[in-house]
Amino acid sequence: MAKISAVERNKKRERLTKRDAGKRAELKALIKDRALEPEDRFQAVLKLAQLPRNGSKTRVHNRCELTGRPHSVYRKFKLGRIMLRDLASQGQIPGMVKSSW
């Protein structure tokens, strides 16, 4: 099990990311718009830099929903490889069967 503080920190980052997503997208669009004056674009860069660092999508780490494990997490199931294997062998994941050929 991962530390509870690490899992909670990641959840906080997810909340901040959802909250700031619109503002970030708006500022990034202004920055990329070549039709604007360079001064206006630079002001958008400064405003983007003032937003909280944890509001960026790249700060969120994929973690296992059951254990909080940060490595080898399957995006489709949001489970780590160990829990995925355990649940699949118990038949608790619909449609997943052990491969045989």
Curated annotation (Swiss-Prot):
InterPro entries given in the database record: Ribosomal_uS14 (IPR001209), Ribosomal_uS14_bac/plastid (IPR023036)
Gene Ontology biological process terms from the UniProt entry: translation
Region called Disordered, residue ranges: 1-20
UniProt superkingdom: Bacteria
Any one GO cellular component localisation term in the record: small ribosomal subunit
Keywords assigned: Ribonucleoprotein, Ribosomal protein, RNA-binding, rRNA-binding
One Pfam family, short name: Ribosomal_S14
GO molecular function: rRNA binding; structural constituent of ribosome
Subunit text: Part of the 30S ribosomal subunit. Contacts proteins S3 and S10.
Family listed: Belongs to the universal ribosomal protein uS14 family.
Function: Binds 16S rRNA, required for the assembly of 30S particles and may also be responsible for determining the conformation of the 16S rRNA at the A site.
Designated name of the protein: Small ribosomal subunit protein uS14
Species whose genome carries this gene: Rhodospirillum rubrum (strain ATCC 11170 / ATH 1.1.1 / DSM 467 / LMG 4362 / NCIMB 8255 / S1)
